[in-house]
Amino acid sequence: MAKKSMIVKALRKPKYKTRQKNRCKLCGRPKGYMRDFGMCRICFRNHASAGLIPGVSKSSW
């Protein structure tokens, strides 16, 4: 879990666009961010396996 201060800091609009850092909307993790879903890979995996993300299923071949 990210510190609350870091999450609040990331939510503020930066002075320059290049300073913006994408963070997971659920846990605040800055790395492993998936832009299409707005969450990190760990939260994505948990939600996908629980069936909370429509249209996403575990692949097998």
From Swiss-Prot:
Residues involved in Zn(2+) binding? 24, 27, 40, 43
Instruction: Name the Pfam families on file.
Output: Ribosomal_S14 (PF00253)
Which molecular function terms from Gene Ontology are attached? rRNA binding; structural constituent of ribosome; zinc ion binding
Q: Which residues form a coiled coil?
A: none
GO CC annotation: cytoplasm; small ribosomal subunit
Annotated signal peptide:
none
Q: Name one GO biological process term.
A: translation
Query: Which protein family is named in the record?
Result: Belongs to the universal ribosomal protein uS14 family. Zinc-binding uS14 subfamily.
Q: What does this protein do?
A: Binds 16S rRNA, required for the assembly of 30S particles and may also be responsible for determining the conformation of the 16S rRNA at the A site.
| Quaternary assembly | Part of the 30S ribosomal subunit. Contacts proteins S3 and S10.
Matching PANTHER family, A to Z?
30S RIBOSOMAL PROTEIN S14 (PTHR19836), SMALL RIBOSOMAL SUBUNIT PROTEIN US14M (PTHR19836:SF19)
Can you say what this protein is called?
Answer: Small ribosomal subunit protein uS14
Tell me the organism's taxonomic lineage.
Bacteria, Pseudomonadati, Spirochaetota, Spirochaetia, Spirochaetales
- The gene it comes from is rpsZ
